[in-house]
Regions:
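Transmembrane helix-bundle signature of multi-pass secondary active exporters and lipid flippases
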Residues: 16, 20-76, 100, 135-142
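Short membrane-interface helical motifs at transmembrane helix boundaries
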Residues: 99-129
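Transmembrane alpha-helical core residues of multi-pass small-molecule transporters
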Residues: 57-60, 93-96, 164-171, 193-201
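Primarily residues marking transmembrane-helix entry/exit sites
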Residues: 11-19, 54, 124, 128
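Small-residue-rich hydrophobic transmembrane alpha-helices
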Residues: 50-103, 145-156, 160
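Membrane-interface helix-loop junctions in multi-pass transport and translocation proteins
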Residues: 1, 48, 111, 119, ...
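Interhelical loop/hinge segments that connect adjacent transmembrane helices in multipass membrane
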Residues: 1-30, 211-221
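A late C-terminal transmembrane helix in Major Facilitator Superfamily
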Residues: 135-140, 149-176
Length: 221
């Protein structure tokens, strides 16, 4: 980038204001699954559900986990004529991840992988199938969230992203509480709660960024 001689000096207070919402979001994202595990472990089928979740988290994260990194693209390619292309690329990545996951979990390949590659029992594999199917929703939600996060970073509006973190925790707790008296398997309840938390988090950050009514501003380089 060319030097910007007229740019004001960076102040530490501004860095703190910019970073603390990101730190909060990262902390909540890291703590959501342990929080869910605490709820699940207290159920009657807690031990089995935790075993299922350990497998589901590991396998389900493979097709979509990398989508979190595309949030860096709007800032990396921030010229005005690039943003639409970046948006299409991100959503294309989300569609690719969804097809990848669906091709595995909605076909007999899932049962084969669970029993022959992972090496778990047929009964445990059966309990993994529904949670893995629910995980097919994550590529769409995560790709949209990553794009919105990228816009927030581009516009330096990270404080608008902060409310999404507590909304995710609240949603997870509410959904787990609402499903606690159902006959659903513990791992299924946990996966529904996790996807619900991601979805509400994405909606809240979209609303927060959009609420400012600020057009997407880009810097010419």
């Amino acid at each position: 980038l060319p030097p910007q001689h007229d740019a004001p000096p960076l102040e530490m207070a501004y860095v703190v204001r910019f970073f603390w919402p990101l730190a909060l979001i990262m902390a909540v994202q890291s703590g959501t699954r342990p929080l869910i595990n605490i709820f699940v472990a207290r159920a009657v089928d807690g031990t089995e559900a935790l075993a299922v979740l350990t497998i589901v988290y590991a396998l389900g994260h493979i097709p979509y986990g990398w989508l979190n990194e595309v949030r860096n693209l709007p800032t990396a390619f921030r010229e005005a004529n690039n943003l639409a292309k970046v948006r299409r690329f991100i959503f294309g990545c989300g569609a690719f991840s969804f097809v990848w996951m669906a091709a595995i979990v909605w076909t007999p390949a899932a049962d084969y992988i669970l029993q022959n590659w992972v090496g778990i029992s047929p009964e445990l594999a059966m309990h993994c199938l529904i949670p893995l199917s629910i995980f097919c929703g994550f590529p769409i939600v995560v790709s949209l969230r990553s794009y919105i996060h990228g816009i927030g970073l581009l516009q330096h509006r990270t404080q608008a992203m902060a409310p999404s973190a507590p909304s995710r925790v609240a949603t997870v707790i509410l959904v787990l509480s609402a499903l606690s008296d159902t006959d659903l398997h513990g791992a299924t309840r946990a996966t529904i709660a996790l996807l619900s938390g991601h979805t509400v988090e994405t909606l809240v950050v979209w609303w927060s960024i959009r609420r400012g009514g600020k057009e997407i501003e880009v810097t010419e380089v």
